[in-house]
Amino acid sequence: MRDGGASDHRRGAGVSDVEGLLRELAPQVLGALVRRYEQFDACEDAVQEALLDAAVQWPEQGLPDNPRGWLVTVASRRIIDHIRSEHARRRREESAAVSVPADAFTAPAPDEERASGQDDTLTLLFLCCHPSLSPPSQLALTLRAVGGLTTAQIASAFLVPEATMAQRISRAKQRIKATGAAFRLPPEGERADRLRVVLHVLYLIFNEGYTATSGPELHRAELTSEAIRLTRAVRRRLPGDGEVAGLLALMLLTEARRPARTGPDGGWSRSPSRTAACGTGGSSRRASSWSATP
């Protein structure tokens, strides 16, 4: 997995390379900011601004030595400006100084982020799949905050108006804020149950993409590919978990069957099948705990 360091990235990357890198780093950066500042909405806005800056600058100026650290630093400056503005507007500098850590007003240096090497993607997934949220809200928030899809893309995938999807995501964020959920992994005693919720959400995203429940398209590739990408991210953090490996195996094997699904002979496509076999890493036997997709 990329750690945002210079060894993985070449300077002068093209626009498509930058877009792919930003998509991968976005949840890591958002997780780092939420962990530090504990303001989901403000952190997401700050990350989006940093991503826009990077999308403009990096194709022209080349990648920074530590792309993830660059994004965290730029986004941190945005959210610090937001915090200061809020404190000034509400005239609560003294009381805020008590509740906000002293280092919250200092953006971390890129080297600090590189040294920490912490990937908060899994923690962010747990937060987006908080049990207080309804399944539709869990799906929408996961695709927005962790998947990096725009509200318009999510609305299009589920064939609802963009305004409706925006309200759903906004209500989900407000609900999480109201519960006071801390940005940390669930306690050991709750982790297995919470992980099952996360995996169920990823399975629902994949299933909706593989067999669309509405619209003219039989298959929505943006959803299946996103579900596979996020499940891979979970497996990187939990390489020994059989349920995670089983779900990934099911997704890869099912997706490998898709090109032949509407073909004339219904046979396997060798190239996708080889990809699936490599990707499962011998874990396909664990997929039996998940319902097979038609």
Write out the residue ranges for each language-model feature.
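Short alpha-helical segment immediately N-terminal to, or the first helix within
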Residues: L21, A32, A140-R144
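Short, charged helix-capping/linker segments at alpha-helix termini
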Residues: R10-G20, L30-E49, Q57-N66, E162-A163, ...
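Σ70-family region 2.3-2.4 aromatic/basic alpha-helix that recognizes the −10 promoter
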Residues: Q48-A55, D65-E94, K173
